[in-house]
Amino acid sequence: MQNGSTAIVTKRELLALIGTIAGSAAMYNAMTSLGLAADSAYKGPIELSGDVKDASVLVLGAGLAGMTAALELRKAGYKVKVLEYNHRPGGRNWTLRGGDVYTELGDFAQRCEFAEGQYFNPGPWRIPYHHRAVLDYCKRLNVALEPFVELNHNALLHASGAFGGRPQRIRDIETDFRGNIAELLAKVTTQGKLDEAVSTEDRETLLASLKSWGALDQNYAYKADLETAEFRGYAKGPGGGLSAAPVAGETIPLSEILKSRLWRYLQNFAAHLFQTTMFQPVGGMDMIGKAFAREMGDLIHYGAKVVNIAQDSGGVTVSYVDSKDPAAVQTVKADWCVCTIPLSILSQIPLNVGAQMKAAIDAVPYASAVKIGLQFKRRFWEEDEAIYGGISFTDLPIRQIAYPSSDLNRSGRGVLLGAYIFEGASAYEFAALPPAERIARAVDFGSRIHPQYKGEFENGVAIAWHRVPFTLGCAGYWTDEARAQHYDDLCQIDGRIVLAGEHASYLPAWQEGAILSSLDAVARLHERVVKM
């Protein structure tokens, strides 16, 4: 629900209130009941035993789903070949560094001008602690990880029409919202209005918990004092010497927090998917894709654009165009095919599958997303504002500003995620702009939160996923209705072809979904082979 709309509470806003008032555990339980959260189904390395009968498998796509399939099938004894559109492994597991050149639809070319050591992840950028398959493959492939700072209490929440447009610290909004809610609950408890819900013996325990949870005083009131300051910070912090005494800051009235609607953003940290600990590969997310590719050796044929997929009772024939010889159409045959091409692309390729799978492929639209990386002369967010990692949220079209979790407290340049726009009108509006204009707008909007932007900005790159040639969108965007009707048909083996990828999972847009989908697909394919 957008600011200024009618006061109808959506499912997401209901979850936000549950999470901010009752805490992340309560929110996770609510999300699970609504089908929005679950632990990874990964149970450890897959075991494909039995006679593979010298079978061959063609894998289409060298993203994480495709490379997972290729590695596991080769280990089981299959003859494996991989065709990949790009000239690099990883698919959406992608990192841009200085010197990289990327051309999107519309022939807009961007050359990344980042300084040495700086990078930007246009696709996935974080790994939850419970995405066990991704973490296990990182361990097995020796991909070094470091913490990704999701929640930084010193980062900012911003609403253009609230507090005179001034951003507020997350800790201030969170602490004051919690304290005011605790005071209200304590008040109705002492007035006996919860007697039907709370036993007499539990009443005092509830009041004690509210006092502790909300930093209330002896009268169960939330107000500005040094006890409150221990949670929300100080107007003047404790120091040493004659001027050492701390001074508490003023609290924000509940009415102002509610009116600002900044409480909405607190759910982003309570949601199970975003709870600490989060991880990132040291040096960029593509370290995962590169590690897979090293393990695979020469299995991957890069620069291969698939133009036709045919099958009969004896096998699969795929036609493709090699970027080194674009005038010629080449073919490759195999007994089986694991296809991980995004549905947004696959729906445009002639494909010999049954009507049910074809309908499923055509039924899934892809989400629009825009991510913009901005390099600055210095890490002003650290030096001026003591923001080390984390994410700030805003109602401006850029939606998010994320601060790097690597190279903390170092001098020199730094790269921010200057915008992460997922779905909604702003995502499509930014995608329609040339990259230079996207960057200019991100700098303009960001300067309303960090005034240092315009003086410190150097260069940037802007990725609009609907204009990315190899995906034409960010990720599969299932509706509940489409999933109920088409999901099983999408995942079933059709003759000698099986699909895999984040779109064939209940974790769309996450690398975990891609890997789990792939493991499930190759396990079922292998079972069919050994039983033939």
Give the residues covered by each predicted segment.
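N-terminal glycine-rich phosphate/pyrophosphate-binding loop and immediately adjacent elements
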Residues: 43-187
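Rossmann-like dinucleotide-binding core of oxidoreductases
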Residues: 150, 164-165, 173-180, 184-193, ...
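Active-site rim elements
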Residues: 117-128, 274-282, 357-365, 424-436, ...
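Conserved flavin/dinucleotide-binding core of flavoenzymes
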Residues: 4, 8, 17-18, 23-26, ...
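Short glycine/proline-rich turn/loop motifs
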Residues: 48-51, 111-119, 263-277, 419-429, ...
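Mid-domain catalytic core of redox enzymes
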Residues: 302-419, 449
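Active-site/ligand-binding neighborhood in enzyme catalytic cores
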Residues: 154, 161-162, 185-305, 313-315, ...
